[in-house]
């Protein structure tokens, strides 16, 4: 592809509108899954708003444990952010992680839950109304977690 035809990934992010299923309140930044008839719902056991995928460690060794730095790809975003493992539990390559409060000026991560249902992207706005359309950023899709 000629260089002039290439676009930054943030310029070409695929946003789709999906209706929220009944009994779901979906906050902005929440990973979401496809439900019946093209609607979206909350993934099983994924409740925090910011999730990512453990991508790379400083020294290339896994698992990363408490205090280690890990680069994390944020779900639904092309962003890769440096985070520090906030617990003694090991984080493995490709694992879904929770990105939570600050620790020494950087974000903590803790091992996420097993990937019970696969998020398709991240909600771009908040919805509390059944059937309301919300944007879903499909920029980063997950494979299977560990």
What do these predicted ranges mean?
Residues 1-146:
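Glycine-anchored, exposed beta-strand/edge motif detector
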């Amino acid at each position: 592809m000629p260089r002039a035809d290439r676009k930054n990934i943030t310029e070409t992010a695929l946003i789709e509108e999906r209706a929220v299923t009944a009994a779901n309140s979906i906050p902005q930044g929440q990973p979401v899954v496809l439900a019946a008839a093209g609607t979206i719902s909350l993934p099983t056991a994924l409740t925090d708003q910011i999730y990512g995928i453990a991508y790379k460690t400083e020294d290339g060794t896994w698992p990363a444990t408490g205090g280690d730095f890990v680069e994390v790809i944020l779900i639904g975003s092309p962003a890769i952010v440096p985070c520090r493992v906030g617990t003694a539990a090991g984080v493995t390559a490709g694992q879904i992680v929770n990105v939570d409060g600050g620790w020494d000026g950087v974000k903590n991560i803790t091992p996420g839950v097993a990937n019970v249902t696969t998020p398709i992207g991240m909600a771009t706005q908040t919805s509390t109304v059944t059937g309301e359309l919300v944007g879903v950023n499909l920029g980063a899709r997950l494979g299977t977690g560990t």
